[in-house]
Amino acid sequence: MYKLPDKLIDILISDDITIAEDDKSAYVELSFFSPEGQDCSLSIEKGNNIECFCNNIYDYYDNFDVSYETYLWLDSDGHGSNGAPYDMKDVYEDMEWCQNKIYDIFVIVQKYIDENKENE
């Protein structure tokens, strides 16, 4: 099973991303908190190499539906529930932040790949 490089794990951790990787699993869990305290957890398939992992992060970002994720945190009156901000707009903006953070993770991994190809 492919294992993420320790140096990449250290870079992600330094960006306040928690990583749970089981050597026997095809997936890695990436977690972070949004400005409003939303615990965001992503289950990303590692694939056979770092390029596959990077592509899978991008796919997760590209398929992240901010409106749907916002809807999940609204009550029947359109207000935040379960600890989410009261205003729908605030919940939506928090979900946008989460989507941008996922893109940031993609950029970090892509930069790691690019820098290590240059050093080969």
Name these PLM-found stretches.
Residues N49-E120:
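Intrinsically disordered, low-complexity regulatory regions enriched in serine/threonine/proline
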Residues M1-S25, E118-E120:
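Short, extreme N-terminal segment that most often corresponds to the first beta-strand
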Residues I13-L72:
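Amphipathic, interaction-prone secondary-structure segments
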